[in-house]
Amino acid sequence: LFIKRVDTIEFARKNKLSVQVAARDLRYQWFEELRIKHGFDGVATAHHLDDQVGTFLINLARGTGISGLHGIPVKNGHIIRPMLFASRQEIVDYSRENDLPFVEDSSNIYDKYTRNRIRHHVIPQLEKINPSFREGLNDTILNIRDAEIIYKHAIEMARNSIVIVRENQAIIKLVDLLNLNPLNTYAYELLSPY
């Protein structure tokens, strides 16, 4: 067990971040330090289905492109999240049945954080409409991930045929770009790197 205390509020202030984003950044920096120090291949986090659903709904509410709707990845660099299939309650029940300690972030009880308002108020309302809402949304997230792969492939194919990079210049074949549909999406994706 590794424990570290940090001044999240000061880090957030210095870096102009929300406390939640600062806490996440500090946590992942520390995970990477531990991974390197101890020679670990990776670090597993306890993110679960409820986190996945909450992340999707936060991004949906704030407005996002397709990449913001693919949810929390199972693997991202050296971070793996093997519990995304299980709900928080399933993990709590399993822990109790097997006499395992269950540890929860104390900030999860406060409604001052958007993710908690969604967990405590929005998701229960959606489950009144569909008791299997979490599982259904998880299936949707997996479908969006597949669609994102196709989307990125289409953008890359268009980039390879329309964008010519020479030295420090990007030349766009405008006539070919104007023939793409939907034009706004292609134009955004092709031009945003420049």
Residue ranges and their predicted role:
Residues 1-124:
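Core alpha/beta nucleotide-donor-binding catalytic domains of modification enzymes
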Residues 101-103, 132-137, 151:
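Short, structured loop/turn "capping" segments at alpha-beta junctions
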Residues 119-137:
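Conserved anion/nucleotide-ligand pocket segment
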